[in-house]
Swiss-Prot record:
This is Probable RNA-binding protein EIF1AD. Residues 107-188 are annotated as: Disordered. It comes from the Eukaryota. Residues 161-170 have a biased composition (Basic and acidic residues). Residues 14-92 form the S1-like domain.
Length: 188
């Protein structure tokens, strides 16, 4: 089976509307991913274990913390006790709730609150780039007092002559730095 055909079948399976769990299957919530296509999950009764992602879902389906899964139990596993059968999307969850098959322990969880929504807090932060911190709470508390914040920013700036990167003793070519400084001071 080609890659495109496989992806088409997996997508069709994930997007099926009417999913009824078999008697041995369980609905679980994803707590995290320790790696190696394993996901730590929690059942409705609070027991935690690892669930493996079968090869058909790898590179085609993405799972994040808080998502719900339908899993098949594995008897021979000590730590890995289940294998994912299906990733439950919002339409699946709504259908299971209407049918009365949704666990009561997860009743408040399917619709995420605004604090849990898909925000930027879970995204990877590139430490090789300068980050600009924006504090919206502080701006709201000030009530539009922009004059004081502008004055604080001016006070924080270092004068050009006091900046450490401009000191001639720190430069590799001291002669050229001194020449540049004299050129700047004289304006020629």
């Amino acid at each position: 089976m080609s890659r495109a055909t496989k992806r088409k079948h997996v997508t069709r399976e994930v997007l099926e509307e009417h999913v009824v769990p078999a008697p041995q299957q369980r609905i679980v919530r994803v707590l995290g991913s320790p790696g190696n296509n394993l996901h730590e999950v929690e059942t409705a009764d609070g027991s935690r274990f690892l669930a493996s992602m079968p090869p058909r879902f790898r590179h085609h389906v993405w799972i994040k913390r808080g998502d719900f899964l339908l899993v098949d139990p594995i008897e021979e596993g000590a730590k890995v006790k289940a294998e994912m059968a299906l990733v439950l999307l919002r339409p699946h969850v709504r259908f299971l709730q209407r049918q009365g098959l949704w666990p009561t322990a997860f009743a408040a969880s399917p619709d995420r609150t605004p604090q849990e929504s898909d925000g930027d807090s879970e995204l990877f932060v590139n430490t090789n780039r300068a980050t600009i911190e924006t504090d919206t709470e502080e701006e709201e508390e000030d009530g539009g007092d922009t004059e004081s914040s502008e004055e604080e920013e001016e006070d924080r700036e270092e004068p050009l002559e006091d900046r450490p990167e401009d000191r001639p003793e720190d430069c590799a070519d001291v002669g050229s730095a001194a020449q540049r400084r004299s050129t700047i001071e004289t304006g020629t």
